[in-house]
């Protein structure tokens, strides 16, 4: 809707209190009230107002039809949109509507002339607001001369404010000069000040002239002080700008003079220009040269006092500190490299062979790109230290950073330069620190990468570890291609389960298994003991360790896959000796087994009760964990119930399925449903607080259930691992070496394992298998024959015994005429394994 034309109304702008018509006779006793936000309108001012559509616009229409007088009141709380009688002040200003125009949105634009103050006495109507009002008389409050002096002071201070405040227009200055009455002068000055809403209202409510002028003088003085401070700030800023401009022109003149004389004084600029020349001589990527040229040009014009100057300088400093030169051709000595690797680490032949292979290829072909190795193994087996030794053997610098728990992609690829305090990522930082393009970078704990809201660091590593992409690696901060293809990346992990398949595809995996006792003894004698003595300052005292004491220390105080715990207990022992040395007390020169309890207390580990399947319903399994191998005792017990199986011990989904398969197979094997009717099998795997999962406990669960059903305990000394199917097949498993090491550590020397893992067994070094007996099986019938006596086997259904005749090796098959002792069986099995290996 379009607004109509302005409707001229009776003009009462000239009404004065001393006019012929008494003012009180013209002003109505009741007024429509229009609420106003932010600041009130003072008497004696002509001003436009926009009244929104609705009840107030209708009130304006009613007023125009009547006497054209409105009451303007200030809202107390602007956030409270309810324009009620409780939300308006008691004092306001009566105004005469001079002109009105209707707006398209049904709102009304009015031009009003404010006349005098009024006070709300009572409300006649609250929707719309109509109030009965009174018009208080203005009281001098002071003698005439005092009022006159106060008015002059007000005029002088207002002129001072007008001179310093550019917001004062000429019209406002003229209006100020033409106002002669003190009350109107005070109202006018207050209306042009920038005050709080409550301060405005306090002036509106002042009927005593002296009080009103005093309030306005106080507000005016505050405003003058504020304007003065603003002027000082403005002058300071202007002076600073003028100074910067002057310095800029002087620097430009100085540069022009220096160029004429051939003198360069800016050390940073000289350094960056040399860097640019270096890039050009190296035939660097044109994109890099172009970017450095552009940044150097910006740097030459930047003001040192600005933030841009430091941003550009930091960027150029980082670029200048990177190794842009090609990787040097290093002299490779394989024998020296092998000695370096052997010096710090015992065994680890797979890792050492891979490094020597890489060096041999590098020697034959100089353009061999960087290699990415992934060392996987339990804690304490030397993954981090072997990486450091690799760098030493190759003659390269070494840089390590942990990615465990990293959640931000920018940690790898850097932050973009738009952010305050941005820096390059870890990869570029490593190259800056090492100053080598072919350094060795260790990504520690890569299996513990996390995903956060800032991105996926594992995905960022895909580009870093891809030989086809990292030739033009782009860090977010540099935003330039940089060749990292010559970097030798080594990653470490405890397990592969949490690493993405795509990331694993880019790395060559080398498994580091846990150490057996013999290996730990060698490590202790060759490396660990000397290190701990030196660390605690007792090397000069020539303390030695008896070999039997070393074995006892390993078995009784630090039973683990690695040697980190062994180092800790050894460190504790040597500290005890250090106290005796300082106190000048006697101490053993050779540590014997009997001395361990004196220095270290009661042994933490004894012969494990857990590894002894000593009652019916128990069997010992072998498990693999992220911290190495472990033994796993499985217990079975009949309890009252409606059949089925109850599982405890924090077993995962896979082990739960394995237990159901084992129960179904044994039920079918025994062919005696009455054994399981109205009884439930409770299967428990200690310890209950440790989560467990995996498929390799199938034959162990079946053996525990079979032992329970036959009420016969399994033969002692056996540990087993293998996945079981419903038809009795025994399937391959993983982590065989770790399981063998765990069994050997606790005194288990007879291992039942899947025949499909025979190849893996042959790859395990002989010193690990020394003193062990291995029994490969392909079906569960072979497992049962090993674990139970022939009399017990005869209790099983005929079909089971028939299967034994066709499956079991003749050296171990049942025969009533020719009995073979258990010792002979084990000897024959061991001989068979050796013959297969020779073949």
Curated annotation (Swiss-Prot):
Reaction it catalyzes: Hydrolysis of proteins in presence of ATP
Subcellular location(s) per record: Cytoplasm
Residues noted as binding ATP in the record, renumbered to the chain: 377-384
Family: Belongs to the peptidase S16 family.
UniProt region (Disordered), positions on chain: 807-839
CDD domains referenced in this protein's UniProt entry, alphabetically: RecA-like_Lon
Active site: 696, 739
Alphabetized InterPro entries for the sequence: AAA+_ATPase, ATPase_AAA_core, Lon_bac, Lon_bac/euk-typ, Lon_lid, Lon_proteolytic, Lon_Prtase, Lon_prtase_N
Residue intervals of the Lon N-terminal domain: 31-224
Induction: By heat shock.
GO molecular function: ATP binding; ATP hydrolysis activity; ATP-dependent peptidase activity; sequence-specific DNA binding; serine-type endopeptidase activity
GO BP terms in the entry: cellular response to heat; protein quality control for misfolded or incompletely synthesized proteins
Record organism: Leptospira interrogans serogroup Icterohaemorrhagiae serovar copenhageni (strain Fiocruz L1-130)
Alphabetized UniProt keyword annotations: ATP-binding, Cytoplasm, Hydrolase, Nucleotide-binding, Protease, Serine protease, Stress response
CC annotations in GO: cytoplasm
Cross-referenced Gene3D superfamilies: 1.10.8.60, 1.20.5.5270, 1.20.58.1480, 3.30.230.10, LON domain-like (2.30.130.40), P-loop containing nucleotide triphosphate hydrolases (3.40.50.300)
EC number(s) reported in the record: 3.4.21.53
PANTHER family found in the cross-reference section: LON PROTEASE, LON PROTEASE HOMOLOG, MITOCHONDRIAL
Nucleotide-binding found in the keyword field: yes
Protein name: Lon protease
Protein's job: ATP-dependent serine protease that mediates the selective degradation of mutant and abnormal proteins as well as certain short-lived regulatory proteins. Required for cellular homeostasis and for survival from DNA damage and developmental changes induced by stress. Degrades polypeptides processively to yield small peptide fragments that are 5 to 10 amino acids long. Binds to DNA in a double-stranded, site-specific manner.
UniProt subunit comment: Homohexamer. Organized in a ring with a central cavity.
